[in-house]
Amino acid sequence: VSSLSGSGSGSVDERLPVIAVTGMAFEARIARGPGVEAVFAARSDLLERALSEALARGCSGIISFGTAGGLAPELEPGTLVIASSVSGPFGIIDTDPEWSARLFAAFAGTPLEARAVRGTMAGVAAPLTGVQEKSSMYRATGALAVDMESHIAGAIATARGLPFAMCRAIVDPAWRSLPSAATAGLRDDGTTTILPILRELLKEPSQLGALLRVAGDARAARTSLVQARHALGVAGALGV
């Protein structure tokens, strides 16, 4: 799924937007705006298709934007990660250092300054929902956080010779496992529905407490993403 909004500024072509790659519809709604087109899907083939369609219209760069699972144990929900690279199924893919530096600098003097970190990310094909899974990934990679879209965005950006950057907000911290109800409502296309979540809770009502904690984590991540998008827009940091 994709949507185009506004015209961007960039060294490649001032009329071309940056493409924000996300996994979920709400992330895309936050990301899109003047100069930024957003594509989203939870299933990798759908995401690749949406990104390919957006690329056919032209772009000046690709940014992976949205939420992530925490791997580094010291990082709280709502922490923003501006990544230097993503390691995953396609190996290690570096981000554009100058663009990444401008993204990070945009948070100076804002409430986000204390919540933003730089480091590496991990990319996976299936969600890491358990504490042990996250711990193993952290030991293996040293990555601060993990998501399912950044390695795809990075591989395509590299193949096309486009600048690539990443801005991700942590939802579930390293020490928190996700109950099955937390992911039950996510459709392949990146939209959500409530009925599967309710069915999971009916099957296992004891998940409710954990689900409410996840909801609190999600609010923190969403707040950080909204604030980040505003700060990046004000600073002009989304233009390549």
Language-model segments: residues:
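Glycine-rich phosphate- or other oxyanion-binding loops that anchor nucleotides, phosphorylated ligands
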Residues: 13-240
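Intrinsically disordered, low-complexity terminal tails and inter-domain linkers enriched
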Residues: 3-14
